[in-house]
Amino acid sequence: MSRINEASKNVMRRAQPAWIATLLSAAVAWGGYPAAALASARSEKSHESDEVVRFELHPNPQFQRCLAQFPDDAQRAPSVEVTVVRGSQNDSLSLRGRNIKPGLKFDLFTVEHTNLAADATVDPAFRGNFGLATYQSDLDASEEGRVRAAIRTILLDENFSFDPTVALAPTGAFNVGFWFDDPDAAVGCGFNPQNPTPFNGDHKAGPLAMISTPDANTRLGPLCTHADTSTTPARCAP
């Protein structure tokens, strides 16, 4: 409910860039020194960077060739950009990808853990458990090799689930990834379709295709923008 309390603040934040521009213009017109105005503008820009979060998803290395539209062209490797805008009641996520093999279908999840390190290489400490996972959307690669998705839900900092019946405390899922919907789509890269993963509506999906990377210091995913490093491991502090 803390987002509702922020609603009036968000309205003022959206209005502030206009008066900042007016203040700068007035300072210059009157021959004044706009240092204070510039400092205010820089502060506003810094705050806006907290309201809009951008990050990339990276291919799961073992299955990149089965994912790629141009598997032999390193200059046209699969790429996906994610933009999340913080809202007063919920957040909006926009996903845009290209150079994906046309016709492939995927399933988008928010997950607790990623199998990649901060440099997008496979994390040697990963043991196959993505932790808490929530199904968010389907993805379809177009004839041009593009994928798009848009969702609205709680994503930044306050994204969590819990279940007291199994003693699961509130647990965040701050990574974003998507899985091959069809297990057979990744056979050419060594996936055994007789051992599907649960990452689609039928719980018979293929392997992970692309996923976000964690922060190098906190090891939290990009959906956490306020990390509390006073604890070990670090946790997200809304």
Residues covered by each model-derived region:
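Signal peptide processing junction and immediate N-terminal pro/mature segment
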Residues: G31-R42
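Bacterial N-terminal signal peptides
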Residues: A21-G32
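N-terminal secretory signal peptides that target proteins for export/translocation
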Residues: M1-A15
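Long, low-complexity, intrinsically disordered N-terminal extensions of eukaryotic proteins, enriched
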Residues: S2-R3, A18-W19, A39
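N-terminal leader/targeting pre-sequences
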Residues: S40-P238
